[in-house]
Design a protein with these regions (language model features):
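Aromatic "clamp/platform" in nucleotide-sugar-dependent glycosyltransferases that forms part
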Residues: 263, 282
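Conserved donor-binding/catalytic core segment of Leloir-type glycosyltransferases
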Residues: 196-212, 218-221
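Glycosyltransferase donor-sugar binding loop
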Residues: 51-52, 173, 205, 232-245
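Short hydrophobic beta-strand element within catalytic cores of glycosyltransferases
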Residues: 299-302, 312
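A short, well-ordered alpha-helix in the C-terminal region of glycosyltransferases
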Residues: 191, 328, 335, 342-356, ...
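Carbohydrate-associated surface elements
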Residues: 150, 172
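Conserved acidic donor-binding segment of nucleotide-sugar-dependent glycosyltransferases
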Residues: 314-315, 319-326, 335-340
């Protein structure tokens, strides 16, 4: 199978925007990882995306992935020309998000009798079928993938999509890379950062923006520090300059108990140093950082929102609390930090849940089957793995 994978942005050519935000989006991470997983399974994959900068190449190979950047203002026309010439062997389409040029791929697929699958990885991407002509085209795909039950409900209620077309399937993570550390490994990692082996460590890893609940984090950590001066906070991620400044100020005001680490290439060591993950985000799909933390053995305190409620079950894999309620976050974080046995039990349950329903070894074959199906084949794979 030669799969055309369409995504709005991919390898845009700059690591950070002018205001400090990393330019690589969750959709881009998923596109890259899914392409690699599909290639491992013997499929050819071409990623079609926007060309945003003059200096980026129109076509190149990146890690074995054929990447084509489409030129403005005629991306749809260029896409159709390529599908009839340089990429005429494409016989299946996989769309992540709702890039405008993808409507031409959908129409082309229908004309040729090829399957087309659309995956939404965020609540904000849900479309209203009758809103405009593009939305009407997006509502005609062969199959749909929702990474959460909230997105599935949005497909049905707003997009008018038949339930039998919708598969609820995690985007997946590499559980062979995100692993629980040994006692010795955790001790060594902490020593490298000057953190006591006996300290209780809270971890936050996400973009430093308001939507991720950084303002709530700024409120909850002083509460935790006041109750447990020996606890430590690791803040991993780059983002808005003003919020980064406020985090550094908070670290000083809490006696240096918080480490503001900025953007890192590889977050695993920071998960492995931790005891509890905290995630006060305002809205999510299926949070990758939460999956990574859980796979690394951390129970979590999270906002009670879509996506998080597909992963965190109170008293079993962590706790859900009301969004923006800093006091509730602090209370549950302190409860977990002070309960070694409960923390260990919930961490083990978190690892088991992620391995059961979110590992690439579980997800990728199901993804490939949906993409190549010419008939509706919806199934709730997430629900099937939820026994905690």
């Amino acid at each position: 199978m030669h799969i055309a994978l369409l995504v709005k942005d991919f390898a845009v050519g700059e690591k950070f925007s002018k205001d400090g935000l990393p330019t690589k989006s969750g959709a881009e991470f998923h596109a890259e990882n899914h392409a690699k997983e599909l290639i491992k399974r013997g499929h050819r994959v071409t990623i079609f995306t926007r060309k945003r900068h003059f200096y980026t190449k129109s076509r190149e190979s990146m890690g074995g992935i054929d990447l084509v950047r489409l030129h403005e203002p005629s991306r749809g026309t260029e896409l159709l020309v390529r599908l009839m010439t340089t990429h005429k062997t494409v016989d299946a389409f996989y769309i992540i998000g709702t890039p405008k040029f993808a409507v031409w791929a959908i129409r082309f697929a229908h004309a040729r009798g090829f399957p087309v699958t659309l995956a939404l990885t965020g609540k904000a991407e849900i479309f209203d079928a009758g809103k405009n002509w593009r939305s009407r085209v997006f509502s005609t795909c062969t199959n749909y993938i929702a990474t959460t039950h909230e997105i599935r409900d949005g497909y049905i209620q707003r997009g008018g999509i038949a339930p039998e077309k919708i598969s609820v399937l995690a985007h997946g993570i590499d559980t062979e890379r995100y692993v629980v550390p040994t006692v010795e490994e955790k001790k060594r990692l902490r020593e490298e950062q000057g953190i006591s082996p006996d300290a209780r460590v809270l971890v936050f890893c996400a973009r430093i923006v308001r939507d991720k609940g950084v303002d709530t984090l700024l409120k909850l950590w002083p509460m935790v520090h006041a109750a447990d001066a020996g606890a430590r906070l690791l803040v991993v991620g780059g983002g808005k300059h003003e919020l980064m400044r406020r985090l550094h100020e908070m670290a000083k005001e809490t006696d240096g108990s918080a480490r503001i680490l900025g953007e890192v290439d590889w977050p695993l060591p920071y998960y492995q140093m931790g005891d509890v993950y905290v995630f006060p985000s305002r809205h999510e799909a299926l949070p990758t950082s939460l999956l990574e933390a859980m796979a690394s053995g951390l129970p979590a305190v999270v906002s009670d929102i879509g996506g998080c409620n597909d992963l965190i079950f109170d008293g079993r894999t962590g706790y859900r609390v009301p969004t923006e309620d800093a006091a509730a976050f602090a209370e549950k974080a302190l409860q977990l930090l002070g309960d070694d046995a409960g923390r260990r039990r919930m961490g083990e349950a978190a690892v088991a849940l992620v391995h059961r329903m979110c590992a690439y070894s579980v997800v990728s074959d199901k993804l490939a089957a949906v993409i190549q199906s010419k008939e509706p084949c919806g199934k709730d794979f997430l629900l099937a793995g939820m026994e905690v």
